């Protein structure tokens, strides 16, 4: 259960983040007519939110545990989705993309750091290989499909689609936690 929890958190966090981030410039600039400089600024803030928390995420995982940081990542992603359901303007895109970056950081780092605790020494190359193949294949599919989904649906619908992946992440984490503590 822990290996699956780590894999699901990492893969779907990357998929959700890539799916929405890739569609953002198209939605902001081409569809909503927000300036290219503001669109670029939102992406810059998003990237900062993806990586700056890494300075403390490891310590948060040590203090609170992998699962709690994963739940926090899901909640941060939920803020992204909720914000995206309101008016599509510069401020809402900015808030949504900052929380998208923060959620990705918590989920991806907690997932990848949990992964190394889920296998024996002789399994490490195979386990890491499977993980990377699945994570980056799903991420590539999300990137390639973002423009298609945006053209066929809407920014709001794309965000709602991401709820499915958040539910899967939460359920895999709950399952792993219950297996760890069967008395719950």
Question: Model-flagged regions — what are they?
Answer:
Residues 52-66, 150:
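Helix-to-loop junctions at the C-terminal end of transmembrane segments
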Residues 148-166:
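A membrane-interface helix-boundary motif in multi-pass transporters
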Residues 106-119:
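Intracellular juxtamembrane helix-capping segments at the cytosolic ends
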Residues 22-42:
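Short amphipathic helix-loop junctions that connect adjacent transmembrane helices
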């Amino acid at each position: 259960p822990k290996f699956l929890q780590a894999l699901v958190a990492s893969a779907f966090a990357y998929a959700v983040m890539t799916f929405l981030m890739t569609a953002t410039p198209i939605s902001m600039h081409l569809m909503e007519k927000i300036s290219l400089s503001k669109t670029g600024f939102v992406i810059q803030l998003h990237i900062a939110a993806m990586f700056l928390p890494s300075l403390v995420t490891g310590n948060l995982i040590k203090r609170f545990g992998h699962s709690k940081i994963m739940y926090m990542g899901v909640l941060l992603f939920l803020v992204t989705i909720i914000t995206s359901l309101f008016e599509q303007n510069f401020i809402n895109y900015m808030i949504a993309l900052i929380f998208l970056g923060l959620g990705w950081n918590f989920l991806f780092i907690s997932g990848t750091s949990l992964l190394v605790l889920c296998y024996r020494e002789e399994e490490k190359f195979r386990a890491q290989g499977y993980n990377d193949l699945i994570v980056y294949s799903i991420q590539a599919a999300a990137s390639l499909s973002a423009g298609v989904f945006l053209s066929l649906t809407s920014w709001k619908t794309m965000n709602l689609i991401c709820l499915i992946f958040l539910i899967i992440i939460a359920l895999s984490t709950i399952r792993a936690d219950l297996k760890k503590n069967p008395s719950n």
